[in-house]
């Protein structure tokens, strides 16, 4: 059994997920949910020596301190990322923190290399695209037209998978849709064995969280096309580095994307049973998205925008329906963490594999529409189509939440 108390000691080093990557961090405070108090190291400044680990008496949260409600009921840690400004210090749960050991350091390097390769691949594709255009090759519109001609053959092979796929086992996993806290990190890849336990439901019992933190999850692997991985990495950079947030409501919402996918693929299906399975899969994704958005699909900078939407919906006395407001990039974030959601359920392995197969078929379809849904530049606009800049005032409030 892993000794979590020793692995995540006050003042000690750890690794934590932020975005699709892992970073070295220092534990400044530890929250005890049973006493509703936290302990901290004296003068918990980022530059302070980790050797000075003499604990002070437990303290209550101050008026200017807060812990995300999604993780406050479990043990969590206030960490400082090495080399980062203190404004990025934040509370994280067992879902994002990892022990500082050789295995996790290797995982950190592997994720960094994957992100670099994805970025490199995207740049090479963009260069080839520009070269083709300059030599009189087909324009983007021409390429999309060509893609649509081959759409039939791809959709046909895609549709066949629905003939044998079923998401009947998903019902047992719907409770996991409420999982994970706001600002949880997102991966650019979901095919790394042993790191699919990164974000788990804070609604789970502390004991279950301990098990999740100490043991690897089942090896459920999702093959995300390299171009879509690049989209996730770019998305992370837009929000965390460029301080941008997605324009809302999105021009093309999650509901519109899934409705179009269901409509196009269902035309290739002859069996009513297959069409029913397709409808159930799309309905399940919509359900997961609405339940998961506020808990696991938003970066820290996006929380304020989400809270403002909640306040507006409350004022208008209308329920907030995320699938009608958020767009394809947030749907792709959900897809990237589906293996973790699935592996936290009681679904049998065969049902998990069938659901993953359906999702990979959906990713193939998304790849064919990548320019339509993930192009951050709209020729009809002078500004960014998917992302907007935030003001310094917004950033200050959002990062202080």
UniProtKB/Swiss-Prot annotation:
Any single biological process term in GO: nucleosome disassembly
A GO-annotated cellular component: Rpd3S complex
Keywords, in A-Z order: Chromatin regulator, DNA damage, DNA repair, Nucleus, Phosphoprotein, Transcription, Transcription regulation
Locations listed in the record: Nucleus
PROSITE patterns the UniProt entry points to: MRG
Compositionally biased residues, Polar residues: 39-53
Comp. bias regions, Basic and acidic residues: 54-63, 117-126
Pfam families, per database record: MRG (PF05712), MSL3_chromo-like (PF22732)
Gene3D superfamilies documented for this protein: 2.30.30.140, MRG domain
Single GO MF annotation: histone reader activity
Positions of the Tudor-knot domain: 13-98
Modified residues (Phosphoserine): 201
Region span, Disordered: 39-65, 117-210
Compositional bias segments (type: Low complexity): 153-190
Annotated MRG domain residues: 216-399
Additional information: Present with 1890 molecules/cell in log phase SD medium.
Role played: Component of the NuA4 histone acetyltransferase complex which is involved in transcriptional activation of selected genes principally by acetylation of nucleosomal histone H4 and H2A. The NuA4 complex is also involved in DNA repair.
PANTHER family, per database record: MORTALITY FACTOR 4-LIKE PROTEIN, MSL COMPLEX SUBUNIT 3
Subunit (UniProt): Component of the NuA4 histone acetyltransferase complex composed of at least ACT1, ARP4, YAF9, VID21, SWC4, EAF3, EAF5, EAF6, EAF7, EPL1, ESA1, TRA1 and YNG2.
Family per record: Belongs to the MRG family.
Name of the protein this chain belongs to: Chromatin modification-related protein EAF3
Organism phylogeny: Eukaryota, Fungi, Dikarya, Ascomycota, Saccharomycotina
């Amino acid at each position: 059994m892993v000794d979590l108390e020793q692995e995540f000691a006050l003042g000690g080093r750890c690794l934590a997920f932020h975005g699709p990557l892992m970073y070295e961090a220092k534990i400044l405070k530890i929250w005890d949910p049973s006493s509703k108090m936290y302990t901290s190291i004296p003068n918990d400044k980022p530059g302070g020596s980790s050797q000075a680990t003499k604990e002070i008496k437990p303290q209550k949260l101050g008026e200017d301190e807060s812990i995300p409600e999604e993780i406050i009921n479990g043990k969590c840690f206030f960490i400082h990322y090495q080399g980062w400004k203190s404004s990025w210090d934040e509370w994280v749960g067992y879902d994002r923190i990892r022990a500082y050991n050789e295995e996790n350091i290797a995982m950190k390097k592997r994720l960094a290399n994957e992100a670099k390769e994805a970025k490199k691949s995207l740049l090479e594709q963009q260069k080839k695209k520009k070269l083709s255009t300059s030599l009189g090759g087909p324009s983007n519109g021409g390429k999309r037209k060509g893609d649509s001609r081959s759409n039939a053959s791809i959709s046909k092979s895609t549709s066949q998978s629905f003939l044998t796929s079923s998401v009947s086992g998903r019902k047992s996993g719907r409770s996991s849709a409420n999982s994970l806290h706001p600002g949880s990190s997102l991966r650019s890849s979901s095919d790394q064995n042993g790191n699919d336990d990164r974000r788990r439901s804070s609604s789970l019992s502390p004991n279950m969280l301990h098990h999740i933190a100490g043991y690897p999850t089942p090896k459920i692997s999702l093959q995300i096309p390299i171009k879509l991985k690049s989209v996730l990495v770019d998305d992370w950079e837009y929000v965390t580095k460029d301080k941008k947030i997605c324009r809302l409501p999105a021009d093309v919402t999650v509901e519109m994307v899934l409705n179009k996918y269901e409509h196009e693929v269902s035309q290739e299906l002859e069996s009513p049973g297959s069409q029913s399975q397709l409808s159930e899969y799309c309905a399940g994704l919509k359900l997961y998205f609405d339940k998961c958005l506020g808990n696991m699909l938003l970066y820290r900078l996006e929380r304020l925008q989400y809270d403002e939407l909640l306040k507006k919906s409350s004022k208008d006395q209308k329920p907030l329906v995320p699938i009608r407001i958020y767009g394809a990039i947030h749907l792709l974030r959900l897809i990237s963490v589906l293996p973790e959601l699935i592996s936290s359920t009681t679904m049998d392995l065969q049902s998990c594999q069938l659901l993953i197969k359906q999702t990979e078929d959906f990713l193939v379809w998304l790849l064919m529409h990548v320019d339509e849904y993930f192009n951050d530049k709209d020729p009809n606009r002078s500004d960014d189509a998917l992302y907007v800049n935030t003001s310094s005032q917004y950033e200050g409030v959002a990062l202080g939440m």
